[in-house]
Amino acid sequence: NLRFGVERMRTAFRASAGRPPAERVALLEAEAARFEEEDREACAAMGRHGAAWIAAHLGADPAGPLRVLTHCNAGALATTGVGTALGVVRALAAGRPVAVFADETRPFWQGARLTAWELAKDGIDVTILPDVAAASVIASGKVSVAVVGADRIAANGDVANKVGTYGVALACRAHGVPFVVAAPRTTLDSACPTGRDIPIEWRDGAEVLLLDPAGESPLSVAPAGVPALYPAFDVTPAALVDAIVTEAGLSTAPHADGLARLLALP
Protein backbone atom coordinates (compact mmCIF):
# COMPACT_ATOMS: atom_id res chain seq x y z
CA ASN A 1 0.00 0.00 0.00
CA LEU A 2 2.90 2.37 0.75
CA ARG A 3 4.48 1.57 -2.61
CA PHE A 4 1.14 2.22 -4.31
CA GLY A 5 0.92 5.62 -2.62
CA VAL A 6 4.44 6.59 -3.61
CA GLU A 7 3.86 5.54 -7.22
CA ARG A 8 0.59 7.44 -7.30
CA MET A 9 2.33 10.63 -6.19
CA ARG A 10 5.19 10.06 -8.65
CA THR A 11 2.65 9.74 -11.45
CA ALA A 12 0.98 12.98 -10.38
CA PHE A 13 4.37 14.68 -10.22
CA ARG A 14 5.28 13.58 -13.74
CA ALA A 15 1.86 14.63 -15.04
CA SER A 16 2.38 18.14 -13.66
CA ALA A 17 5.62 18.67 -15.61
CA GLY A 18 5.82 22.02 -17.37
CA ARG A 19 3.45 23.80 -15.02
CA PRO A 20 4.58 26.68 -12.77
CA PRO A 21 6.10 25.48 -9.46
CA ALA A 22 3.27 26.82 -7.31
CA GLU A 23 0.70 25.11 -9.50
CA ARG A 24 2.61 21.82 -9.34
CA VAL A 25 2.68 22.00 -5.55
CA ALA A 26 -1.06 22.69 -5.45
CA LEU A 27 -1.78 19.76 -7.77
CA LEU A 28 0.32 17.40 -5.66
CA GLU A 29 -1.34 18.59 -2.45
CA ALA A 30 -4.75 18.00 -4.01
CA GLU A 31 -3.75 14.48 -5.09
CA ALA A 32 -2.44 13.71 -1.60
CA ALA A 33 -5.70 14.96 -0.09
CA ARG A 34 -7.70 12.68 -2.41
CA PHE A 35 -5.49 9.74 -1.47
CA GLU A 36 -5.96 10.52 2.22
CA GLU A 37 -9.74 10.64 1.90
CA GLU A 38 -9.86 7.43 -0.16
CA ASP A 39 -7.76 5.64 2.46
CA ARG A 40 -10.02 6.92 5.23
CA GLU A 41 -13.09 5.64 3.39
CA ALA A 42 -11.38 2.32 2.65
CA CYS A 43 -10.58 1.78 6.33
CA ALA A 44 -14.19 2.48 7.30
CA ALA A 45 -15.45 0.06 4.64
CA MET A 46 -13.06 -2.67 5.80
CA GLY A 47 -14.36 -2.16 9.31
CA ARG A 48 -17.96 -2.60 8.22
CA HIS A 49 -17.29 -5.66 6.05
CA GLY A 50 -15.11 -7.34 8.66
CA ALA A 51 -17.47 -6.68 11.57
CA ALA A 52 -20.44 -7.98 9.57
CA TRP A 53 -18.60 -11.20 8.62
CA ILE A 54 -17.46 -11.82 12.19
CA ALA A 55 -20.94 -11.19 13.59
CA ALA A 56 -22.47 -13.58 11.06
CA HIS A 57 -19.75 -16.20 11.56
CA LEU A 58 -19.86 -16.20 15.36
CA GLY A 59 -23.64 -16.02 15.62
CA ALA A 60 -25.37 -14.83 18.78
CA ASP A 61 -23.62 -12.38 21.08
CA PRO A 62 -21.50 -14.12 23.72
CA ALA A 63 -22.38 -13.74 27.38
CA GLY A 64 -19.37 -11.49 27.89
CA PRO A 65 -17.43 -9.22 25.53
CA LEU A 66 -16.27 -10.36 22.12
CA ARG A 67 -12.59 -11.17 22.63
CA VAL A 68 -10.34 -10.21 19.72
CA LEU A 69 -6.63 -11.00 19.41
CA THR A 70 -4.49 -8.84 17.14
CA HIS A 71 -0.81 -8.77 16.26
CA CYS A 72 1.47 -5.77 15.58
CA ASN A 73 -0.22 -2.47 14.64
CA ALA A 74 -2.71 -2.04 11.81
CA GLY A 75 -4.57 0.98 13.10
CA ALA A 76 -4.90 4.72 12.76
CA LEU A 77 -1.16 5.16 13.27
CA ALA A 78 -0.53 3.10 10.11
CA THR A 79 -3.27 4.64 7.94
CA THR A 80 -5.12 7.93 7.50
CA GLY A 81 -8.33 6.42 8.90
CA VAL A 82 -9.40 4.07 11.66
CA GLY A 83 -7.01 1.37 10.48
CA THR A 84 -7.35 -1.98 8.76
CA ALA A 85 -7.42 -4.63 11.50
CA LEU A 86 -8.21 -2.01 14.13
CA GLY A 87 -10.87 -0.59 11.83
CA VAL A 88 -12.62 -3.95 12.16
CA VAL A 89 -12.12 -3.88 15.93
CA ARG A 90 -13.53 -0.36 16.16
CA ALA A 91 -16.54 -1.31 14.04
CA LEU A 92 -17.19 -4.29 16.30
CA ALA A 93 -16.84 -2.13 19.41
CA ALA A 94 -19.43 0.31 18.07
CA GLY A 95 -22.10 -2.37 18.34
CA ARG A 96 -21.13 -4.67 21.20
CA PRO A 97 -18.69 -4.96 24.13
CA VAL A 98 -15.21 -5.87 22.87
CA ALA A 99 -12.04 -6.83 24.72
CA VAL A 100 -8.76 -6.97 22.80
CA PHE A 101 -5.60 -8.98 23.37
CA ALA A 102 -2.74 -7.07 21.74
CA ASP A 103 0.41 -9.13 21.15
CA GLU A 104 3.39 -7.05 22.31
CA THR A 105 5.24 -7.63 19.00
CA ARG A 106 8.91 -7.85 19.88
CA PRO A 107 11.47 -6.44 19.44
CA PHE A 108 9.98 -3.01 18.65
CA TRP A 109 6.78 -3.47 20.66
CA GLN A 110 4.34 -2.15 18.05
CA GLY A 111 1.49 -3.96 19.79
CA ALA A 112 2.37 -2.73 23.25
CA ARG A 113 3.34 0.80 22.27
CA LEU A 114 1.00 1.57 19.37
CA THR A 115 -1.99 -0.77 19.30
CA ALA A 116 -2.55 -0.69 23.05
CA TRP A 117 -2.21 3.11 23.06
CA GLU A 118 -4.74 3.52 20.23
CA LEU A 119 -7.33 1.26 21.80
CA ALA A 120 -6.93 2.63 25.31
CA LYS A 121 -7.30 6.16 23.92
CA ASP A 122 -10.60 5.07 22.32
CA GLY A 123 -11.81 3.52 25.57
CA ILE A 124 -11.65 -0.04 24.21
CA ASP A 125 -10.67 -2.71 26.73
CA VAL A 126 -7.16 -3.89 25.81
CA THR A 127 -4.71 -6.31 27.43
CA ILE A 128 -1.12 -6.77 26.26
CA LEU A 129 0.09 -10.32 25.67
CA PRO A 130 3.67 -11.54 25.44
CA ASP A 131 4.04 -12.90 21.90
CA VAL A 132 4.90 -16.33 23.29
CA ALA A 133 1.59 -16.44 25.22
CA ALA A 134 -0.69 -15.98 22.21
CA ALA A 135 -1.10 -19.69 21.41
CA SER A 136 -1.77 -20.58 25.04
CA VAL A 137 -4.42 -17.88 25.40
CA ILE A 138 -6.07 -19.01 22.15
CA ALA A 139 -6.03 -22.62 23.38
CA SER A 140 -7.63 -21.58 26.67
CA GLY A 141 -10.80 -20.47 24.88
CA LYS A 142 -10.36 -16.81 25.78
CA VAL A 143 -10.20 -15.63 22.14
CA SER A 144 -13.31 -15.35 19.94
CA VAL A 145 -11.54 -14.23 16.76
CA ALA A 146 -8.10 -13.07 15.59
CA VAL A 147 -7.89 -10.04 13.30
CA VAL A 148 -4.59 -8.89 11.77
CA GLY A 149 -3.39 -6.63 8.98
CA ALA A 150 -1.12 -7.53 6.07
CA ASP A 151 1.91 -6.11 4.30
CA ARG A 152 1.41 -8.14 1.12
CA ILE A 153 -1.07 -10.76 -0.06
CA ALA A 154 -0.20 -13.16 -2.88
CA ALA A 155 -2.66 -14.07 -5.63
CA ASN A 156 -3.46 -17.38 -3.95
CA GLY A 157 -4.21 -15.72 -0.59
CA ASP A 158 -0.92 -16.34 1.23
CA VAL A 159 -0.41 -13.43 3.64
CA ALA A 160 2.87 -11.72 4.56
CA ASN A 161 2.69 -9.81 7.83
CA LYS A 162 4.74 -9.09 10.93
CA VAL A 163 6.62 -12.15 12.14
CA GLY A 164 4.51 -14.10 14.61
CA THR A 165 1.35 -13.86 12.53
CA TYR A 166 1.82 -17.39 11.18
CA GLY A 167 1.99 -18.79 14.70
CA VAL A 168 -1.24 -17.03 15.63
CA ALA A 169 -2.95 -18.49 12.55
CA LEU A 170 -1.73 -22.01 13.36
CA ALA A 171 -3.04 -21.75 16.92
CA CYS A 172 -6.37 -20.41 15.68
CA ARG A 173 -6.81 -23.30 13.24
CA ALA A 174 -5.86 -25.86 15.89
CA HIS A 175 -8.48 -24.53 18.30
CA GLY A 176 -11.30 -23.54 15.98
CA VAL A 177 -10.87 -19.76 16.25
CA PRO A 178 -11.59 -17.70 13.10
CA PHE A 179 -8.51 -15.97 11.66
CA VAL A 180 -9.26 -12.79 9.68
CA VAL A 181 -6.95 -10.55 7.64
CA ALA A 182 -7.91 -6.94 6.86
CA ALA A 183 -6.04 -5.06 4.13
CA PRO A 184 -6.80 -2.64 1.28
CA ARG A 185 -6.95 -3.95 -2.28
CA THR A 186 -3.61 -2.28 -2.98
CA THR A 187 -2.05 -4.94 -0.72
CA LEU A 188 -3.26 -7.70 -3.06
CA ASP A 189 -0.51 -8.57 -5.53
CA SER A 190 -1.84 -10.44 -8.55
CA ALA A 191 1.70 -10.59 -9.97
CA CYS A 192 2.88 -12.62 -6.97
CA PRO A 193 1.61 -16.21 -7.37
CA THR A 194 2.20 -17.51 -3.83
CA GLY A 195 3.82 -16.62 -0.55
CA ARG A 196 6.99 -18.40 -1.67
CA ASP A 197 7.50 -15.49 -4.06
CA ILE A 198 7.42 -12.87 -1.30
CA PRO A 199 10.92 -11.88 -0.14
CA ILE A 200 11.24 -11.79 3.64
CA GLU A 201 13.31 -9.04 5.25
CA TRP A 202 15.92 -10.37 7.64
CA ARG A 203 16.91 -7.63 10.03
CA ASP A 204 20.00 -7.33 12.19
CA GLY A 205 19.81 -10.05 14.82
CA ALA A 206 21.28 -7.61 17.33
CA GLU A 207 17.85 -5.97 17.51
CA VAL A 208 16.49 -9.12 19.18
CA LEU A 209 19.31 -9.09 21.72
CA LEU A 210 18.51 -5.61 22.98
CA LEU A 211 15.69 -4.30 25.12
CA ASP A 212 14.34 -1.17 23.41
CA PRO A 213 16.79 -1.42 20.46
CA ALA A 214 15.68 1.95 19.08
CA GLY A 215 16.01 3.73 22.42
CA GLU A 216 18.80 5.94 23.67
CA SER A 217 20.18 3.33 26.09
CA PRO A 218 19.30 -0.17 24.83
CA LEU A 219 19.93 -2.95 27.35
CA SER A 220 21.45 -6.27 26.32
CA VAL A 221 19.32 -9.28 27.27
CA ALA A 222 21.72 -12.05 26.16
CA PRO A 223 25.33 -13.08 26.75
CA ALA A 224 27.89 -11.21 24.68
CA GLY A 225 28.80 -12.96 21.45
CA VAL A 226 25.62 -15.04 21.15
CA PRO A 227 23.94 -14.42 17.76
CA ALA A 228 20.24 -14.12 16.98
CA LEU A 229 18.05 -14.54 13.91
CA TYR A 230 15.37 -11.97 13.16
CA PRO A 231 13.05 -12.40 10.17
CA ALA A 232 10.87 -9.29 10.36
CA PHE A 233 7.92 -10.91 8.56
CA ASP A 234 6.44 -14.33 7.96
CA VAL A 235 3.97 -15.81 5.48
CA THR A 236 0.71 -17.38 6.60
CA PRO A 237 -0.62 -19.95 4.10
CA ALA A 238 -3.97 -19.08 2.55
CA ALA A 239 -5.48 -22.31 3.89
CA LEU A 240 -5.23 -20.91 7.43
CA VAL A 241 -7.01 -17.64 6.59
CA ASP A 242 -10.77 -17.77 7.05
CA ALA A 243 -11.49 -14.36 5.54
CA ILE A 244 -9.54 -11.62 3.77
CA VAL A 245 -11.37 -8.31 4.17
CA THR A 246 -10.89 -5.40 1.77
CA GLU A 247 -12.74 -2.15 1.19
CA ALA A 248 -14.50 -3.75 -1.80
CA GLY A 249 -15.71 -6.81 0.06
CA LEU A 250 -14.13 -10.01 1.30
CA SER A 251 -12.82 -13.36 0.21
CA THR A 252 -13.29 -16.62 2.05
CA ALA A 253 -11.18 -19.74 1.59
CA PRO A 254 -10.15 -20.91 -0.94
CA HIS A 255 -9.02 -17.41 -1.84
CA ALA A 256 -7.60 -17.37 -5.38
CA ASP A 257 -10.95 -16.85 -7.12
CA GLY A 258 -12.27 -14.49 -4.46
CA LEU A 259 -9.22 -12.24 -4.59
CA ALA A 260 -9.28 -12.16 -8.39
CA ARG A 261 -12.93 -11.10 -8.21
CA LEU A 262 -12.12 -8.31 -5.75
CA LEU A 263 -9.27 -7.05 -7.92
CA ALA A 264 -11.54 -6.99 -10.98
CA LEU A 265 -14.06 -4.67 -9.31
CA PRO A 266 -13.95 -0.99 -10.38
Labelled PLM ranges:
Residues 97-98, 103-266:
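Conserved phosphate- and dinucleotide-binding cores of soluble alpha/beta proteins
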Residues 1-129:
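N-terminal active-site beta-alpha-beta segment that forms phosphate/nucleotide-binding
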